[in-house]
Amino acid sequence: MKNLVILSGGFDPVHMGHVYMLEAASLIGEIVICLNNDDWLTRKKGKPFMSWIERATIVGNMKYVIDVLPM
């Protein structure tokens, strides 16, 4: 059985730092992303750069990610 790594964040926008983090986390196990919702990003940044569904689609299609959950 593989280890499970749970990461959370806004990923708005997705950038190379996220890619490096996912590559490093993949050495530990399979990755599940808890993706911050648009309301959280609005409180933090004023408004999201990309919608939750856009961010979830991008992050969910990354090589090491097995699931994306709303947070």
Regions found by a protein language model. Give the residues of each.
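Nucleotidyltransferase catalytic core that binds NTPs
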Residues: 1-71
